[in-house]
Amino acid sequence: MISPEILRRYPFFGFMTDAELKAVAMIAEEVSYKEGETLLESEKPANSLFFLVEGSVDHLYVVNDHNHTKTRKEFHIDEFAPGDIVGISALIEPYRYTATVRAHTPTCAIKIAGDALRALCEVDTALAYRLMRETAKAAMERLHSTRILLAAARAT
């Protein structure tokens, strides 16, 4: 459990009431990762949602050749910094991560249990709607950023 005041610092949670913040804080914890440690891995079950507090992480797109188990390539997409959200797949079916996120520097994050957050949404549909609205905004921002990076890569 963390203090609801920690969540209040993030615009993503700006819509939440005190009671909602308290409920989410109950299913959250602060976690730390050393440089090079993996926060979440592509194709694995999306069990958690993360908000970066300190440090930076690399957002990697992973290509696996399922016919040849030794063939795996990682492509660096972007780097995330404090305030960014990662692991939104924990809120979107089929609840599997679509990328790998690895600590670029020593990193501290708020980790929220995905199953518990989804359970809160099942009970409170208004919370679910507002949470999904914020999740959609985060996904759209990520898509926009990726398009810019792709355009820049093609321009060179």
What is the predicted role of each segment?
Residues 1-156:
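Cytosolic regulatory regions built on CNB/CRP/Popeye-like sensor folds
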